[in-house]
Amino acid sequence: MPLHALSGDPFDALGDPNRRAIVELLRTGDRSVSELAEELPISRPAVSRHLRLLKRAGLVADRAEGTRRLYRLDDEGIAAVREYLEDVWGEAPTRFRLLAENTSERTGRDAR
């Protein structure tokens, strides 16, 4: 799934330290809102709000288990972010080389 296919902006969603902490906690497995709230310095309603935003951004999915909901990382959304970053990072050495060449050309001209 390409990054633009996600309904929300995953980078905006990851801009908040509490949401990043939730993502880190979910890396270890499925958790309920209560389990997440026990690990974080925020209330259960705040955790729920953050999870809604992460879900809208395609980074988190949920499922019902009995009377509670369990949250997990959404593999497709995480893969889309990873693919995007790999594409951007893969171009970085070429861009750096071009920048270095342009800088040295300008420096050489300025020295004359």
What are these regions (language model features)?
Residues 12, 21-24, 55, 61, ...:
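A cross-family signal for key residues in well-ordered alpha-helices
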Residues 2-43, 68-79:
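N-terminal helix-turn-helix DNA-binding core of bacterial DNA-binding proteins
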Residues 55-66, 72-73:
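Beta-hairpin "wing" of winged helix-turn-helix
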Residues 29, 46-48, 53:
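Short glycine/proline-centered loop/turn elements that form peptide/ligand docking sites
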Residues 24, 38, 49, 55-56:
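Alpha-helical residues within the helix-turn-helix
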Residues 1-6, 24, 78-112:
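Amphipathic alpha-helical dimerization/coiled-coil segments
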